[in-house]
Amino acid sequence: MAEGSFNNPQIVPIRGIGQCDAMLEPILLFIVAAFLLAGFVKGVIGLGLPTVSVGLLAIAMPPSRAIAIVIVPAIITNIWQTFVGPYLRDIVRRLWPLMAGTAIGAWLNAGMLTGPYARYGTIFLGFLLMIYAAVGLRQFVLTVAPRHEKWVGGIVGVVTGMISAATGVQVIPSMPFMQAIGMEKDELVQALGVFFTVATVALAFNLSTAGLLDQTTALPGVIAMACSFAGMAIGQRVRTRMKPEVFRRWFLIAMIFLGVYLAGAAIYKLYAPA
């Protein structure tokens, strides 16, 4: 199969102004589609950009490469979400143990993307997507008393950081925790932006240290960021014409199927006889 195909994904640099054929590389077209869809999901339900994009890109490349492409769009969109609302000071006061724990957890598990267990990353990602979707579909109602927020948040943060360092996904168990402490809808949306900004910056530090952020991710990163904002704009417009809960349900069901495919294909590839 030709270079740049899904079985051997490589980012081919643009060599000159008139040479637009590199833009038509299948992997770049796949990145465009993945981030348009991920941005659309974020525009409709307010989250899901890294989860969807990493999950889709993992079909065509190792999770470490997928995360390196996702990192810049994730940081930019989360910074934007951080400052949309008046709750920033209260969010930092309540969630600093969660954010500090996430940074520590990401640092503790920094070697997962490049170490001897990196080959299991796609399997772990697949199972994590299934868990994330199942929790969302069941809509578990959990509560954490205010007096326990700090220490529970710290533990949840460490676990989230370790999972993030291995898969790039930061919603488990951080999001159920933020829902459990009783944040209102608008405050929760802004809190997700604040938390994901910190978590993504911590992950970016891991990627940079491991040498995964280099010039080969520059072009895909720019394309991904543009497509993310385009998808978000479309999703925000569509949100007024559809029921977000109905869309969210079908989105989570699709995440289960994606998780099954990723985990199943990776296990087969890892253990199938030569």
Give the location of each predicted region.
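Selected transmembrane alpha-helices and immediately adjacent juxtamembrane segments
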Residues: G18-A60, L142-L192, A199
